[in-house]
Design a protein with these regions (language model features):
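Short active-site loop/helix that positions an aromatic residue
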Residues: 135-146
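Short, well-ordered beta-strand elements within core beta-sheets of diverse protein domains
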Residues: 126-132
Length: 232
């Protein structure tokens, strides 16, 4: 994971140089890349506290830029008509004879934290809830199960929860010249974090997942900053 991530960052740096990126942008790309890789290196050396501290400092560096941190209803992670109510969905898999109640569709209670899994943004032992903005998104995330095993429910959020935006797409890259400098630099920082947190773990039964180190550290950093979650 670390070596592959380094290769991806090298590609980003080379592409930025080739496109004539300014010195400040190059400094952001190199600086953020090096610090994320350093965080991984420290984690592998069992210096977990300092590894997490590096990611926390990166989140603090991004600050309160509204492109990066905003309420659910105003976040750039969910483009569209702001006057319409945002709808989210939550799904669970279960046999046809299992009738899920409303309380079954929220996250595990803290009394059952021993059953919480090790997922991308889930801190082990701390139940969390994954939502999609469509039932189709839920179906994809649960592995495209048979309809008879798929249970989905709408979830209505108050909308004032502050979330960290990792829903960054390369399609935005074409529009960077239209943005002000501050937003371009914010986009670059978020993009480098997005690369580190977007790996797919192909081995289902693997206990330790290096690919989730930065993701889970980022979630802990967001909790310390008082954010309600991460959009990705």
């Amino acid at each position: 994971y670390k070596e592959d991530l380094k290769n991806k960052y090298d590609i980003v740096q080379n592409q930025a140089r080739a496109s004539g990126a300014d010195d400040e942008s190059m400094g952001i790309i190199i600086g953020f890349s090096d610090r994320i890789l350093k965080s991984l290196e420290l984690y592998y050396k069992a210096d977990i506290a300092e590894s997490n501290n590096i990611i926390l400092e990166l989140v603090k560096d991004i600050g309160n830029n509204p492109f990066a941190v905003n309420s659910v209803v105003n976040s750039d992670a969910f483009p569209g008509d702001r006057t319409n109510e945002l709808q989210f969905f939550r799904s669970r898999l279960g046999p046809p004879n299992k009738a899920f109640k409303a309380k079954d569709m929220i996250h595990l209670p803290n009394s059952m934290r021993s059953k919480s899994g090790n997922y991308r943004f889930s801190i082990p032992g701390n139940p969390s809830m994954y939502l999609a903005n469509s039932s189709y998104g839920c179906w994809i995330e649960t592995g495209c199960p048979a309809e008879i095993d798929f249970n989905v429910s709408p979830v209505l959020l108050e909308g004032n929860q502050r979330i960290f935006n990792l829903a960054i797409s390369l399609r935005d890259f074409r529009c960077l010249n239209e943005f002000e400098e501050e937003r371009v630099h914010c986009w670059l920082k978020l993009y480098l974090l997005t690369i580190a947190t977007s790996y797919v773990v192909k081995e289902e039964n693997r206990t330790f997942k290096s690919e989730y180190i930065i993701s889970q550290s980022l979630m802990m950093a967001c909790k310390k900053m008082g954010y309600g979650g991460i959009a990705y």
